[in-house]
Amino acid sequence: MAEKQTAKRNRREEILQSLALMLESSDGSQRITTAKLAASVGVSEAALYRHFPSKTRMFDSLIEFIEDSLITRINLILKDEKDTTARLRLIVLLLLGFGERNPGLTRILTGHALMFEQDRLQGRINQLFERIEAQLRQVLREKRMREGEGYATDETLLASQILAFCEGMLSRFVRSEFKYRPTDDFDARWPLIAAQLQ
């Protein structure tokens, strides 16, 4: 029984990895059909549906992975780092680095892979970005409590500016077919962001 569960879990992971790889390839800029995905995995469409009731559930699983990866690591940054600017820098670097290491998933983050899918999937990505923006806003607001002095600019505006930078770099990465890596020149770009944190 345990072997059967492990085999099923492995096949599910194989399907998700194949979907992520297809999103990374030129196929990712077009609608991915279950027929193409089944051929990529080397199984029938019926076999895909034994593991996932729909393609939407496959995307849901990839979005869950993205959410878990990013939110867990953001929480670790907040636990380990106390300096506000360092926290913000690490969160930005996390978002950009995650996108760079996972090009196929970046197509999901930017919404490109979801254009032909159910609207609720884009809604989940929107919620993820709202959660990240709320975390950034909280980090910015805690500066006053931690360091005795806040920012001259409203924290909501600063948080949206930081997140817009990240989203822009991820979109540029996808638009360039993964040529312009989000972390390229980060050490030169970060001071431009940090200069806004006054």
Curated annotation (Swiss-Prot):
The keyword Ribosomal protein does not apply. Required for nucleoid occlusion (NO) phenomenon, which prevents Z-ring formation and cell division over the nucleoid. Acts as a DNA-associated cell division inhibitor that binds simultaneously chromosomal DNA and FtsZ, and disrupts the assembly of FtsZ polymers. SlmA-DNA-binding sequences (SBS) are dispersed on non-Ter regions of the chromosome, preventing FtsZ polymerization at these regions. Belongs to the nucleoid occlusion factor SlmA family. It is found in: Cytoplasm, Nucleoid. Residues 33-52 bind DNA. Residues 10-70 form the HTH tetR-type domain. One of its GO terms (biological process) is negative regulation of division septum assembly. Keywords: Cell cycle, Cell division, Coiled coil, Cytoplasm, DNA-binding. SUPFAM superfamilies: Homeodomain-like (SSF46689), Tetracyclin repressor-like, C-terminal domain (SSF48498). Residues 117-144 form a coiled coil. GO terms for cellular component: bacterial nucleoid; cytoplasm. Pfam families: SlmA-like_C, TetR_N. Homodimer. Interacts with FtsZ. GO terms for molecular function: DNA-binding transcription factor activity; transcription cis-regulatory region binding. This is Nucleoid occlusion factor SlmA.
